[in-house]
């Protein structure tokens, strides 16, 4: 059975970097995906699902939730490793509920933990505005992305806390101890 870990955190929390470094350090055992990468890879594959996704993306439309979840589940089942990390998902209560429903209807993937990389808004803002990655790293866009992240957060955390799947990592440190703690946490959860 595949073991899934979801990594969530504010923009600038380092969740993508953390997940990527963990998977790179243990590539024979851990695969890291981001939802956007999965959708782009499916389009590039030329599959029927990829053509469906492309029909939305090429028009600038959002990909429907059921298509996104089918893409994620398909990738999880086909992953080359037993342990899979997805960062930045779920982003809404609707995504969370639908993903939970789909996972509960199958027996190949087990959600083992939802790891929150917790940082203050000040630290997140400082990191995002300091990284200078492009046009989307300005103050107005940061506050919009922060709002999109925080609005559903309490409901998402409550849901996973009730299932005893929510774990917190202090993201306000340098990358090395964060990654080390996350690796250790994943190993600990897997041994339960």
Swiss-Prot record:
<feature type="binding site">
    <location>
        <begin position="12"/>
        <end position="17"/>
    </location>
    <ligand>
        <name>ATP</name>
    </ligand>
</feature>
<feature type="region of interest" description="LID">
    <location>
        <begin position="130"/>
        <end position="136"/>
    </location>
</feature>
<keyword id="KW-0808">Transferase</keyword>
<protein>
    <recommendedName>
        <fullName>Adenylate kinase</fullName>
        <ecNumber>2.7.4.3</ecNumber>
    </recommendedName>
</protein>
<feature type="binding site">
    <location>
        <position position="173"/>
    </location>
    <ligand>
        <name>ATP</name>
    </ligand>
</feature>
<feature type="binding site">
    <location>
        <position position="133"/>
    </location>
    <ligand>
        <name>AMP</name>
    </ligand>
</feature>
<dbReference type="InterPro" id="IPR000850">
    <property type="entry name" value="Adenylat/UMP-CMP_kin"/>
</dbReference>
<dbReference type="InterPro" id="IPR033690">
    <property type="entry name" value="Adenylat_kinase_CS"/>
</dbReference>
<feature type="binding site">
    <location>
        <position position="131"/>
    </location>
    <ligand>
        <name>ATP</name>
    </ligand>
</feature>
<dbReference type="InterPro" id="IPR027417">
    <property type="entry name" value="P-loop_NTPase"/>
</dbReference>
<feature type="binding site">
    <location>
        <position position="95"/>
    </location>
    <ligand>
        <name>AMP</name>
    </ligand>
</feature>
<keyword id="KW-0418">Kinase</keyword>
<dbReference type="GO" id="GO:0044209">
    <property type="term" value="P:AMP salvage"/>
</dbReference>
<feature type="binding site">
    <location>
        <position position="35"/>
    </location>
    <ligand>
        <name>AMP</name>
    </ligand>
</feature>
<comment type="function">
    <text>Catalyzes the reversible transfer of the terminal phosphate group between ATP and AMP. Plays an important role in cellular energy homeostasis and in adenine nucleotide metabolism.</text>
</comment>
<dbReference type="GO" id="GO:0005524">
    <property type="term" value="F:ATP binding"/>
</dbReference>
<feature type="binding site">
    <location>
        <position position="145"/>
    </location>
    <ligand>
        <name>AMP</name>
    </ligand>
</feature>
<feature type="binding site">
    <location>
        <begin position="88"/>
        <end position="91"/>
    </location>
    <ligand>
        <name>AMP</name>
    </ligand>
</feature>
<keyword id="KW-0545">Nucleotide biosynthesis</keyword>
<comment type="subunit">
    <text>Monomer.</text>
</comment>
<keyword id="KW-0547">Nucleotide-binding</keyword>
<keyword id="KW-0963">Cytoplasm</keyword>
<keyword id="KW-0067">ATP-binding</keyword>
<comment type="similarity">
    <text>Belongs to the adenylate kinase family.</text>
</comment>
<dbReference type="Pfam" id="PF00406">
    <property type="entry name" value="ADK"/>
</dbReference>
<feature type="binding site">
    <location>
        <position position="40"/>
    </location>
    <ligand>
        <name>AMP</name>
    </ligand>
</feature>
<dbReference type="GO" id="GO:0005737">
    <property type="term" value="C:cytoplasm"/>
</dbReference>
<comment type="pathway">
    <text>Purine metabolism; AMP biosynthesis via salvage pathway; AMP from ADP: step 1/1.</text>
</comment>
<feature type="region of interest" description="NMP">
    <location>
        <begin position="34"/>
        <end position="63"/>
    </location>
</feature>
<dbReference type="GO" id="GO:0004017">
    <property type="term" value="F:adenylate kinase activity"/>
</dbReference>
<feature type="binding site">
    <location>
        <begin position="61"/>
        <end position="63"/>
    </location>
    <ligand>
        <name>AMP</name>
    </ligand>
</feature>
